[in-house]
Design a protein with these regions (language model features):
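Short, conserved charged micro-motifs
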Residues: 55, 161-167, 334-340, 384-391
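Glycine-rich phosphate-binding loop signature in dinucleotide/nucleotide-binding domains
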Residues: 59-65, 134-136, 177-179
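Internal nucleotide-binding/catalytic subdomain
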Residues: 153-272, 281
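Short beta-strand-to-loop capping motifs
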Residues: 156-158, 198, 329-332, 378-384
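Active-site "cap" helix and flanking loop/linker of ATP-utilizing ligase/carboxylase catalytic domains
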Residues: 239-260, 278-338
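Glycine-rich active-site loop/lid that clamps phosphate-bearing ligands
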Residues: 329-360
């Protein structure tokens, strides 16, 4: 039995904690104090700030850990990489994360490898930000270079016409989510969003599956409402996207990681643009639940084995066993009038797993600003894309939540 250090105890860490224990090992979780769902799952937990690398290293040495893991968070991934390097344990080298670990360095990495990204500007001051808005006509997206969970991402539909005070507010609200105090201002591309889950093993890239992504149409934020696998796009488009994905991750070094890349196929000219890339598996249960459902590959088992430095193999090609994906929803700001019975959701045919907890009458729903405001995910599966839509429609008909808002009684936003 080995001891695994897990950094973080939020819901995204629960599947990997369970997987480590299922494989016969012990878990040591470090996290700030709080009602985090990973804490009761752990064999042992310590109240350590997840960004206090030196304290984490000291605890790891004291408890003689054999492996370091974290899931679904770029910010914690950097911490895990630094801790593993300090302890001389397997992991992604910090030097690799420095190349593609934030949105600015990722775009430079893509430029050097011939991967198309939307036109962008890298800014670190209000004056530079305002200068861009004065000189650009196209719609723009503002992104902190090192944010997480879409925090600080904002849309500007008409940059030249924006009021200077509003522009300054957008800058301030976005820059607060960057520890580097830097932003990416990017041309807004309309089209079909596509997501690729892959694996990189010692510099070789293997695509695992490809899906489509749709956002909830909610004012001012970019939040995926659902992601369905496999994608209903042409074989030529799939091949092109897989070739681009290989360019991004090929030859980065001797390590293993599940990867996730987000693309958009332009509605204007069919050009494929990279939007984001991650040296981690997809959140919202993609790595833990959806990859195994679609492909039969237990991705998190590979993650656990590689963290111990053990040899792993990734099949060069995987067949689609079934369709699967997740759906989520947002609730408007206000007071929740109804309670949701989780058992009623679990009993719906096609529902594999859901993360709906705490939806009780009287709960105050705050303003939705980023991905963390979503309710779910609800993982669904079936023999076809039609089955997924049927299950989604049943969920919408079942989850009849009412919220008392300043505009009257409103329900969930699914689309």
């Amino acid at each position: 039995m080995k001891t695994f250090l897990i950094i973080g105890a939020a819901s995204g860490q629960v599947p990997i904690i369970r997987k480590v224990k299922e494989m016969g090992h012990k878990t040591l979780v470090v996290s700030r104090a709080g009602p985090y769902p990973g804490l009761p799952e752990a064999d042992l937990s310590l109240p350590i700030d997840v960004f206090d690398t030196s304290a984490i290293v000291s605890a790891a040495k004291e408890h003689k850990v054999s492996a370091v893991l974290t899931c679904q968070s770029e910010l914690l991934l950097r911490v895990a990489a630094s801790v593993a390097e300090e302890l001389r344990l397997p992991g992604i080298p910090p030097s690799v994360l420095a190349r593609i670990g934030d949105k600015a360095t990722l775009r430079e990495h893509c430029r050097l490898r011939g991967v198309e990204t939307p036109k962008y500007w890298h800014v670190g001051s209000l004056s530079a930000f305002l200068d861009i808005l004065r000189n650009v006509e196209e719609s723009l997206v503002v992104k902190p270079v090192d944010n997480a969970g879409s925090k600080g991402v904002q849309f500007i539909p008409a940059p030249r016409n924006i009021d200077p005070c509003q522009a300054e507010k957008i800058y301030s609200e976005s820059i607060q989510f960057s520890s580097l105090k830097q932003l990416i201002v990017e041309e807004f591309i309309t089209g079909q969003e596509v997501v690729v889950e892959g694996a990189v093993l010692n510099g070789k890239v293997t695509p695992l599956m490809i899906g489509e992504s749709w956002n909830i149409e909610f004012p001012g934020i970019f939040v995926p409402s659902r992601r369905f696998f496999p994608a209903a796009i042409s074989d030529d488009a799939v091949r092109s996207i897989y070739e681009i994905d290989a360019l991004i991750y090929h030859g980065l070094g001797e390590f293993f990681s599940v990867t996730q890349s987000e693309y958009i196929i332009s509605a204007r000219n069919g050009q494929i643009y990279l939007i984001d890339a991650h040296l981690r598996g997809g959140g919202a249960c993609i790595e833990s639940h959806i990859i195994p459902l679609v492909t039969g590959l237990d991705a998190q088992e590979k993650v656990v084995l590689s963290a111990l430095g053990l040899r792993i193999d990734i099949p060069r090609s995987l067949t689609v066993r079934q369709h699967a994906g997740y759906v989520t929803f947002l609730l408007p700001r206000g007071r929740l009038l109804d309670a949701l019975d989780p058992g009623g959701v679990e009993g719906i045919p096609g529902v594999h797993y859901h993360g709906l907890r705490g939806l009780t009458a009287g709960r105050e729903i705050p303003e939705s600003k980023n991905k963390s405001a979503r309710f779910g995910p609800i993982v669904i599966h079936g023999d076809s894309r039609k089955d997924l839509y049927q299950t989604r429609d049943t969920l919408k008909a079942t989850i009849k939540l009412r919220v008392e808002t300043n505009r009257g009684i409103c329900g969930p936003h699914w689309e």
